[in-house]
Amino acid sequence: VLYFDFFPRQGKGGGAWCGYFREQRYRDGEREAPVVGIVANFTRPTATAPALLSLDETETLFHEFGHALHFLFHDVKYRGLSEVEGDFVELPSQIMENWATEPQVLAEYAVHYRTKEVIPEQLVRKIRNSALFNQGFATTELVAAALSDMDIHSIRRYEPFNPEAFEDNALRLQRGLIPQIEPRYRYPYFSHIFDGDY
């Protein structure tokens, strides 16, 4: 069983994720299928138009659906052994995410919501060419976040300190992120590292 919770509402966490309501298990020798949910904060429909996903939202949906497929189709005998090696966790989701902009896949789902016209090949080329736009800055952000995570896990003396000042020093002064752009990957963003079931 797969449930979807696509739209933002008050009190709902930001971002998107996939998780279990019930893990796959065996009971009395019979396999019980998992109950899985994909949660997101996609653009809501309006009074005059359906929910039209941006390219980023579409890739996110494909990504989380990759996790959902992994959860739905694994088959383990002992609970708690359903996990895979840490470096494999994101593979199914990355594969699905990358398929989102493949021309053959786009032709199946990317249609105009009024005319039902399939996305033109010229627009597909533009989408694929734009995928690398601003990649240098995106990579810098990710590297800065990774190095900052290493910084906080490399503290040798445990004494009270100001985490915001520590983070600002790590992200702006040491990594050179420009002050005009707020860092996307602040420490609270990393909740999945210690909160996830990896």
Regions found by a protein language model. Give the residues of each.
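Cation-handling catalytic/transport regions enriched in His/Asp/Glu
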Residues: 1-198
